[in-house]
């Protein structure tokens, strides 16, 4: 099973994907996580370090693909999860999405994809261009990570539009659901997922332990083993892992038009707004 994980930059995709990968591995599955971001830090908490990227390895071997072995690309981290980082071109040049496609071709040529029960793509994706949409062509399911705010949900909707587009182009990828991350509330998330007719898979709260795990290079499951109070969060990831391993049919999301996105949440209770809907304004009194 191949799963592509998308979401707005900075929303916590990599932290979410890494903990999900470990949760799936703890269910006895062989897991590969492929980081698809030029920052190359998707797998940092699993590997505990920044691993060499595909771009760096290709350069090392002077782009002689036939000289590269799986062990040059694939590293094993916490929980037995294998990891790959695509890397990307220097800032301001080239196409990061192209590198993602080339990485998949290289792994297929090495015949390593079939070794795994679950492959997770962690993909850069605020507004999905053709290159970074490439994992959707291979994926069985897509997940979108979003916080409970408009900008993150706007990006999530654009990703849903990409899933719709891929289905129209003949690819059989479905949405597994939306994952709420860094959430103190879920009102906007619930409104959005109802509108796009897609499950809200799980909700991870905003907790200092998550931020610390990212900085220190640990997954939440490692922190749990160290005695940190993160059981509620690891339980949520285990729940989502079991949901994905149940092989849900998934859905083609009922993506919202761009203009409708700006109207969708107007009915939400926003007490900081005046009665005429403008921030800080008050209803004029009758003279």
Swiss-Prot record:
Residue numbers binding Mg(2+): 14
Catalytic activity annotation: chlorophyllide a + oxidized 2[4Fe-4S]-[ferredoxin] + 2 ADP + 2 phosphate = protochlorophyllide a + reduced 2[4Fe-4S]-[ferredoxin] + 2 ATP + 2 H2O
Named cofactor requirement(s): [4Fe-4S] cluster
Keywords noted in UniProt: 4Fe-4S, ATP-binding, Bacteriochlorophyll biosynthesis, Chlorophyll biosynthesis, Iron, Iron-sulfur, Magnesium, Metal-binding, Nucleotide-binding, Oxidoreductase, Photosynthesis
Pathway membership, UniProt: Porphyrin-containing compound metabolism; bacteriochlorophyll biosynthesis (light-independent)
SUPFAM superfamilies according to UniProt: P-loop containing nucleoside triphosphate hydrolases
GO BP terms, alphabetized: light-independent bacteriochlorophyll biosynthetic process; photosynthesis, dark reaction
Annotated residues for binding of [4Fe-4S] cluster: 95, 129
Enzyme class, first EC level, given as a word: oxidoreductase
Membership in a protein family: Belongs to the NifH/BchL/ChlL family.
Description of how the protein assembles with itself and partners: Homodimer. Protochlorophyllide reductase is composed of three subunits; BchL, BchN and BchB.
Function: Component of the dark-operative protochlorophyllide reductase (DPOR) that uses Mg-ATP and reduced ferredoxin to reduce ring D of protochlorophyllide (Pchlide) to form chlorophyllide a (Chlide). This reaction is light-independent. The L component serves as a unique electron donor to the NB-component of the complex, and binds Mg-ATP.
Name by which UniProt lists this protein: Light-independent protochlorophyllide reductase iron-sulfur ATP-binding protein
Organism: Heliobacterium mobile (Heliobacillus mobilis)
